[in-house]
Amino acid sequence: MRRSIGSVLATALVLVGAPLLLLGVSGCGDSDEPAAASQSEFTARGRYGVATRDFVFVDTTRPTQPNGSYAGAPERTLPARVWYPTSPAADRQGTPVRNGGAAASTESVASDGPFPIIGYAHGFLSSRIEAADLKVHLASHGYVVIAPDFPLSNGTAPGGPTFGDLGNQPADLAFVMDAVAAMDGENADLARAVDSSRRGIMGLSLGGGTTLIGAFHPVLHLDRIQAAVASAPVACFFGAAFYAHALPTVLLAGSADELVPLATGPGRAFEFAPPPVILVNLLGGNHLGFTGLDLPGDENSDEIGCKAVAAAIANGDAGIDQLTRKLTENASPDVVDPSSCNRGVCEQRFLQTMGGARQLELAGVAALAHFEAVLRGRADAARFLTEAFAANNPEVEVSVKP
């Protein structure tokens, strides 16, 4: 029997096992409905090799705002890494680095594309190589994944990392996805490999907030995406009016997340977001587990992230005023409602019982199944995610708004 996630969600849930019409899955009892796909299909590495290429894209149409000691710039500079499928024998990736510089592979893209493209949004203080194993996993299953360093929220941002630029980040994702699809010369094979009619976005923490803006915001949403996955999204700042558009979305949560607790992050987003939306709660999982981080000696490895975020906020302007202006520009002031942001950073402690490797594996299963369901039209993948995933894994709860 499923365990309840909490009264904050009770009125919104349609529990796993109920008849549903989500992502092409018909009601229980239909004779022509497919069986759920096997979890091993989403856990195992895919049939493609994986390689990476590094780029620096410059959007000359949008500025980078001033930030502390940084005067700003008339353009937005976006170092980015692309993970892409190759032939199985050409499994070679560029050396991961925090900011630019790695010599990328020149391996050709697999010839049986084009492939869906996924834009990945990193979290606060992080970078484009965040959760690299997840990106490799998706690329091995036939996805082109691109992740930029956002100008003012990455760990080495000029003037110090800030939340204030969050509202500009969805357009950064759209820009780099378009840039890859338009490449020529020695990178023309990447452009040919991208199916721009099949696009998804995903992200973690502040990048999860970026994903929510791109999916739901009445003005800043991205028109050309079909699916989204938000891991531990920062959502306490978004009011009910924020969720103005419907998009098939998976929200990933860890019940032991100290940085973005379930109730004020993914749970709040699930409460307000229009269907179809799925909430996956990983019992005992935390925040940094979505990057695969394991610190076995710690009661909760989020402690290291808590200290880093608290120090960054204490040492600079968090940028809330700038973020509010961006979110409410040409939109109702009700898109912003910080009433749930009433706790200090990591004020509530939780016991982490799920290891980071297991958490990242389960997150990858959920993300891949969702993208397969939406971007490749696989009803068996949708049925797995909404019915079999929780049944197969006692540490997983799944709730659905069809």
What residue spans do the PLM features occupy?
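Bacterial signal peptide processing site
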Residues: G29-S31
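Domain-level recognition of soluble alpha/beta enzyme cores
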Residues: E33-G119, S140, K307-G356, A390
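Alpha/beta-hydrolase active-site loop
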Residues: F163-S196
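Alpha/beta-hydrolase-fold serine-hydrolase catalytic core, especially in secreted/extracellular enzymes
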Residues: P275, G284-N286, G292-P402
